[in-house]
């Protein structure tokens, strides 16, 4: 019997690894990306490349303009993207309810195509300030999924997977390399240019670069300038 999984795919390093993990577990993968008004829209081109390279059965990009709400440095040009490392509290790069919105879209698609597994790249190590990247959030969303759907209330339960939630960036990279992920296809930078070249100074770039160093793997990231 075919097992189908919906995988949230941003085009970044973490979600590419999660897509490879879902495939390695024998799932037929359906990749879901969202054009939500993010600064770094070149990540969607990266998502297309990654979905093709990792053999996703389908890849859908949903338009939902969260820039109309603002509230995040990723969707509001008046808020600066931080470049000075981790800060106390919830980072300004947190997009209000983004994971909940995207998981809900994934849940609807999963029920429509007969999938019962949702995968996403939540990580509580690098992004410990994000409320929707915590283990208790993952557990709570799985409970919601099974309360809010026809399949769930009929006993055909959904499972929400966050396989990299406790992994360091170096561990994630090593796992992805073992599964054949080509990280040169990915874009992680919050301020990547239209060609997908990274700024080299934002927090996401800093974490990504440190991850490749920790993994002992050459960094394939293309930078806008020496950084």
Swiss-Prot record:
Zn(2+) binds at residues 189, 199, 202, 205. Its cofactor is Zn(2+). Disulfide bonds: none annotated. It comes from the Bacteria. Its EC number is 6.3.4.20. Binds 1 zinc ion per subunit. Pathway: Purine metabolism; 7-cyano-7-deazaguanine biosynthesis. This is 7-cyano-7-deazaguanine synthase. It comes from Cupriavidus necator (strain ATCC 17699 / DSM 428 / KCTC 22496 / NCIMB 10442 / H16 / Stanier 337) (Ralstonia eutropha).
């Amino acid at each position: 019997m075919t097992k189908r999984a919906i995988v949230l795919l941003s085009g970044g390093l973490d979600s590419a690894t999660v897509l490879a993990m879902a495939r390695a577990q024998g799932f037929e993968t359906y990749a879901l990306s969202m054009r939500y008004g993010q600064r770094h829209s070149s990540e969607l081109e990266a998502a297309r490349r990654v979905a093709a390279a990792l053999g996703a059965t389908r890849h859908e990009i949903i338009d939902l303009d969260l820039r109309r709400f603002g509230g995040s440095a990723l969707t509001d040009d008046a808020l600066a993207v931080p470049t000075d490392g981790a800060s106390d509290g919830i980072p300004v790069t947190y997009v209000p309810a983004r994971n909940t919105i995207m998981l809900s879209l994934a849940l609807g698609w999963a029920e429509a195509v007969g999938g019962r597994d949702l995968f996403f790249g939540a990580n509580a190590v690098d992004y410990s300030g994000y409320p929707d990247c915590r283990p208790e959030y993952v557990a709570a969303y799985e409970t919601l999924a099974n309360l809010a759907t026809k399949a769930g209330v009929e006993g055909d339960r959904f499972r929400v997977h966050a396989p990299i939630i406790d992994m360091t960036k170096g561990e994630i990279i090593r796992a992805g390399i073992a599964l054949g992920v080509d990280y040169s296809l990915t874009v992680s930078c919050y301020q990547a240019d239209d060609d997908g070249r990274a700024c080299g100074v934002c927090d996401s770039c800093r974490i990504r670069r440190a991850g490749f160093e920790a993994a002992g793997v050459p960094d394939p990231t293309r930078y806008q300038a020496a950084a």
